C-alpha cells in the first residue's frame, strides 16, 4: 500500500474496512466463470460490511510506516538485520481475534508479505520469514488462521506483487531504487516464487476468504503480470477464495471484488476510469 496513506494507517494499524458491495458479473465474461461457492462467498463478503486490516511486519519496529525501507533508501541487506530483533512477545492470536470479533468485524485481513519482501508466515521458498529469520520462531499467520476458524471469523491475506529485496524482481519498477538490489534479474523465477508462496498460503492455512493483491502499479501499463494464470491457480486451490487487486483499474477477469486505497467508492480521486466499476463487490 502506498506511502501516502501512512498518516491514516499507522503501523501496526487496525484499519476498519467498510464494504460497499454489489454482486454482478462484469469481469467474468472472458475466461472466468465463478463457481457456486465463489458466488456464495461474494454474497457473504457483501453482507459482512466490516472487516479489520492488520498491517504488521518488521517495519513496525521502526515506527516510520511500512514504506520506510523505500522512503529512507535503506539497503535491503541492512534492513533485513532488523528481523533479528523482531520478537512480538505479547502476540496472542486468541485475544486478537476475540477483540476484533467483538468489534463486529466479519473478517480479518493481514499482511502475509509486504513490499519489503519479509514473509510473516513459515515459507520453504525463502529464509526471510518470521520463523527462520527472527528469534520469535512462530508462524503468526497459522496461529491467526487456526483461531479464526475456532471463533468463526474469516481470514483474508494481503500479498504484495512487488518486492524491494529480491533480485529477481526485475525490471525494477517505480519504487525501491535505493534498496541496493541488482540491475538485472529473471522475472520468471520471481513469478514462480510468488505462485509457490500463494500455493502454501492456500494449502497449509485452511480456508482463506480472500487474497488482496497490491503493488501492480509499480510497473508501467502493459507489463505482463500473468494475472490470468495466477488467478486460475488461486481459484483452483480454493474456488471460494475471493481475489481483489489494488490497481485502481477496471477489474480483470478472475477478480471477485474491487478495493480502493486513498479513496471512497464513488469519489474516484485516484484516477480510476470509472467504466463498469460498480459491477463487482467493492471494498
Predicted regions and their residues:
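A generic structural signal for short, solvent-exposed coil/turn residues
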Residues: 10, 17-19, 44, 235
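Mature catalytic domains of secreted/periplasmic carbohydrate-active enzymes
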Residues: 26-283
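Helix-centric, low-specificity signal for extended rod-like, repetitive segments
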Residues: 1-3, 19, 35, 42
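Bacterial N-terminal signal peptides that target proteins for export
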Residues: 2-16
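Hydrophobic h-region of N-terminal signal peptides that target proteins for export
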Residues: 16-26
Amino acid at each position: 500500500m502506498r506511502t501516502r496513506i501512512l498518516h491514516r494507517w499507522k503501523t501496526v494499524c487496525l484499519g476498519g474496512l467498510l464494504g460497499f458491495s454489489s454482486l454482478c458479473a462484469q469481469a467474468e465474461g472472458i475466461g472466468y466463470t465463478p463457481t457456486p461457492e465463489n458466488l456464495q462467498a461474494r454474497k457473504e463478503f457483501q453482507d459482512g460490511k466490516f472487516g479489520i486490516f492488520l498491517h504488521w511486519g518488521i517495519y513496525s519496529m521502526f515506527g516510520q510506516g511500512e514504506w520506510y525501507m523505500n522512503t529512507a533508501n535503506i539497503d535491503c541487506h541492512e534492513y533485513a538485520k532488523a528481523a533479528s530483533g523482531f520478537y512480538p512477545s505479547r502476540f496472542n492470536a486468541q485475544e486478537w481475534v476475540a477483540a476484533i470479533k467483538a468489534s463486529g468485524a466479519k473478517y480479518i485481513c493481514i499482511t502475509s508479505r509486504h513490499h519489503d519482501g519479509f514473509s510473516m508466515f513459515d515459507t520453504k521458498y525463502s529464509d526471510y520469514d518470521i520463523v527462520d529469520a527472527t528469534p520469535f520462531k512462530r508462524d503468526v499467520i497459522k496461529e491467526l488462521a487456526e483461531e479464526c476458524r475456532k471463533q468463526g471469523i474469516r481470514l483474508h491475506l494481503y500479498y504484495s506483487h512487488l518486492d524491494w529485496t529480491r533480485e529477481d524482481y526485475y525490471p525494477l519498477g517505480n519504487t525501491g531504487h535505493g534498496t541496493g538490489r541488482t540491475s538485472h534479474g529473471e522475472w520468471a523465477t520471481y513469478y514462480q516464487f510468488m505462485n509457490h508462496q500463494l500455493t502454501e498460503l492456500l494449502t497449509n492455512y485452511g480456508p482463506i476468504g480472500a487474497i488482496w493483491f497490491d503493488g501492480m502499479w509499480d510497473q508501467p501499463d502493459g507489463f505482463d503480470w500473468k494475472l490470468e494464470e495466477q488467478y486460475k491457480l488461486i481459484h483452483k486451490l480454493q474456488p471460494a477464495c475471493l481475489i481483489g487487486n489494488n490497481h485502481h483499474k477496471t477489474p480483470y477477469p478472475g477478480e471477485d471484488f474491487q478495493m480502493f486505497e486513498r479513496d471512497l467508492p464513488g469519489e474516484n480521486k485516484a484516477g480510476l476510469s470509472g467504466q463498469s466499476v460498480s459491477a463487482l463487490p467493492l471494498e
